[in-house]
Amino acid sequence: MKPLSSPLQQYWQTVVERLPEPLAEESLSAQAKSVLTFSDFVQDSVIAHPEWLTELESQPPQADEWQHYASWLQEALSNVSDEAGLMRELRLFRRRIMVRIAWAQTLALVTEESILQQLSHLAETLIVAARDWLYDACCREWGTPCNAQGEAQPLLILGMGKLGGGELNFSSDIDLIFAWPEHGCTQGGRRELDNAQFFTRMGQRLIKVLDQPTQDGFVYRVDMRLRPFGESGPLVLSFAALEDYYQEQGRDWERYAMVKARIMGDSDGVYANELRAMLRPFVFRRYIDFSVIQSLRNMKGMIAREVRRRGLTDNIKLGAGGIREIEFIVQVFQLIRGGREPSLQSRALLPTLSAIAALHLLSENDAEQLRVAYLFLRRLENLLQSINDEQTQTLPFDELNRARLAWAMDFADWPQLTGVLTAHMANVRRVFNELIGDDESETQEESLSEQWRELWQDALQEDDTTPVLAHLSEDDRKQVLMLIADFRKELDKRTIGPRGRQVLDHLMPHLLSDVCAREDAAVTLSRITALLVGIVTRTTYLELLSEFPAALKHLISLCAASPMIASQLARYPLLLDELLDPNTLYQPTATDAYRDELRQYLLRVPEDDEEQQLEALRQFKQAQLLRIAAADIAGTLPVMKVSDHLTWLAEAMIDAVVQQAWVQMVARYGKPNHLNEREGRGFAVVGYGKLGGWELGYSSDLDLIFLHDCPMDAMTDGEREIDGRQFYLRLAQRIMHLFSTRTSSGILYEVDARLRPSGAAGMLVTSAEAFADYQKNEAWTWEHQALVRARVVYGDPQLTAHFDAVRREIMTLPREGKTLQTEVREMREKMRAHLGNKHRDRFDIKADEGGITDIEFITQYLVLRYAHEKPKLTRWSDNVRILELLAQNDIMEEQEAMALTRAYTTLRDELHHLALQELPGHVSEDCFTAERELVRASWQKWLVEE
């Protein structure tokens, strides 16, 4: 234990003079001297009750002793016969335990988290014991309150604020709300009361027992102002009245207060669960709620003004960077996202802060700085209050109390303590300002030129001049003014509430200022106003853009770069949430992490809620697609990587859809019984075309076929038994349904299953044996070409190995070169006649001569032609690696393979970028002439010449 500092050693002599004879100096331990020097509250308490000091010396406080509070208190109350006796015992018990907590805290015998837990549990124990004693007494006097069925009705107490969060201060008010379940009357009393009367009277007595000062002090100051209608409302409300209030009139700040609400005492009963379930939707919205930001900022502004008005300087709770700002930071995430992230629904601050870090909503460094600052500030606050059991958060001005705090906080002196304190509070303030901003500093609103507001507010005509647009060309200036005017007219057709109008009026000057600084102002503004028209009636999205300037900047740059992204954001405003974090926005998920991220994402949705599952799949896909496109636009992903990401994303979606369909089918029919003898599900999904070849684009559909290995005689083992092969057919149908169902978030993917054996006329799902037989005996050459770009994208190892073997066997069949050349060339000519360019003087990048499809046909032809001699050619299903294999196996010269690869990736890159611009896949006839000549020459060499 650290020895007392010099000023405190001097003060000890003053303490000694106050001590009574039984507490002679020589009989005291060094620990006792330290605590008595630090805390006047402990000093006064042990002078009045010397036996408490003896107990402390012989039985020092333990971290887990809060578990005994209830039994200790019951023992103290066992002989209480009247309310006066109850009040006395409650006060003495509270004081005795608070002395023990102060002792443990001063000497740092337990952690600060443990101190907060002990303080909160002590309050809960005292409240519940007082309530239960009074309930019995009131029932004896007035009868037992019952509902219409004659069931006894309890009084439930919601502990709010720090009490609810398990984070009570040393000297603190307690904020409570009283409720009872159902209406009815008392039974068994001398006269009948309705339940409202009974619980109101009981509530009044409970407040008096806890709050009224006596010669023994008080238990806690009770604050009931958080209840519905505050001081003007009923003291106690029924569940029905509570529900009506919060649904109809609950205000933002009441939501914030309710985050920490906790039912005191036994919280596992039927009524407790009912109350919790009733309040949860009010507190945690299912949608992301950005209105929180402005409300919290307004509250913070009110507090800051109060600090100034009351001269609350050096206030570690309410000042800049203080405890309240940490609480606000945590609550922002809870209230914005808590409805969708169960881990954010904790009442306690520190677990919620850990969840925020785990969800990457704050950086680990920021979260750790907040955690350390919070524990530092809470220890300082509790030590400060324990000096005199006084409710204060203002740092002392006198030398003695400064010396006390410096010593207890383990600093050499006061300047050293305040230096560390200042650093902690600066860290908190930085995070707070980055997240919530601060009305007290010069805001964007104040610094923004009045002229931008005029541009938005005044209905300017196309011919009007305005200085802020002087840098634009005349055409662009007219276009911008016309777009603003058209947007304002569009707004008049929509129902926008006063809050939405207020947010829009705040947002638009900032948006116009940023957009009009660009050279492409008119084009960008046209895309953004189209998006805004779709969200103006949904204030939460306007608030997102208004509250997060960085999100607005990302929106502008992405919409400027890509109308496809602008369209996606307009159709699915939920994606605006992705703009908040540039670290993830321009950094797509690692290619091997899509499955895992999707699995975690779906854990938030009930497994049996198909509608929510479908929405979640689509929302995940769109968010990931946006991130890939943003990285593509930013130039951080080359074309090959864009396709890799799009392909891995699609595979993750296939995995999740099959899993969902499987669970639904097994629940209905049971599993096919042949699976009892083997691992896996006996099912595979094969990807063809762009999916099989790792070459997906932004709007590619999925070419899929479904395989199973179910024997003819297999049956399912569920109550509704069906044929095993029928099970797999229904599974495949279910998968198609899950992909194609249109929800508010659109469809998942267009799926084309026509490449299956016998095409659209064939069975949707095929047995592995039938697939092999078809490929060997019935398939056309073009179907073998398609097999070159096929691979299993979902399936158990057995079926995957079987498919790979069939594919390899078919591709390595000996083929007569001339016949194959003719068949491949004629198929290409048919395609060109059917799908070729219908636009004069334009080059269709994919379908025209010298385009992407020609390269694909060249590689497919060469694999089918030479794989019999060089089986290694069957290894890959994508064109780039096939071209590498052709060079490595001396079929194509390396220079030609590299040139074709460059041409192929260049053309695909252009297709990606045209898709981002929502443009068709054709360009001017004079584009890519070198690449086209190269491909034509290669085509001539391999597929025309003898």
Swiss-Prot record:
Cofactor section: Mg(2+)
GO BP terms, alphabetized: regulation of glutamine family amino acid metabolic process
EC number: 2.7.7.89, 2.7.7.42
Adenylyl transferase: region residues: 449-946
GO cellular component, one term: cytosol
EC supergroup of this enzyme: transferase
Domain of life, per lineage: Bacteria
Region feature (Adenylyl removase): 1-440
Alphabetized InterPro entries for the sequence: GlnE (IPR023057), GlnE_rpt_dom (IPR005190), NT_sf (IPR043519), PII_UdlTrfase/GS_AdlTrfase (IPR013546)
Catalytic activity: [glutamine synthetase]-O(4)-(5'-adenylyl)-L-tyrosine + phosphate = [glutamine synthetase]-L-tyrosine + ADP; [glutamine synthetase]-L-tyrosine + ATP = [glutamine synthetase]-O(4)-(5'-adenylyl)-L-tyrosine + diphosphate
CDD domains: NT_GlnE_GlnD_like
Family statement: Belongs to the GlnE family.
Function description: Involved in the regulation of glutamine synthetase GlnA, a key enzyme in the process to assimilate ammonia. When cellular nitrogen levels are high, the C-terminal adenylyl transferase (AT) inactivates GlnA by covalent transfer of an adenylyl group from ATP to specific tyrosine residue of GlnA, thus reducing its activity. Conversely, when nitrogen levels are low, the N-terminal adenylyl removase (AR) activates GlnA by removing the adenylyl group by phosphorolysis, increasing its activity.
PANTHER family named in the record: BIFUNCTIONAL GLUTAMINE SYNTHETASE ADENYLYLTRANSFERASE_ADENYLYL-REMOVING ENZYME (PTHR30621:SF0), GLUTAMINE SYNTHETASE ADENYLYLTRANSFERASE (PTHR30621)
Protein name: Bifunctional glutamine synthetase adenylyltransferase/adenylyl-removing enzyme
Organism: Escherichia coli O6:H1 (strain CFT073 / ATCC 700928 / UPEC)
Lineage: Bacteria, Pseudomonadati, Pseudomonadota, Gammaproteobacteria, Enterobacterales
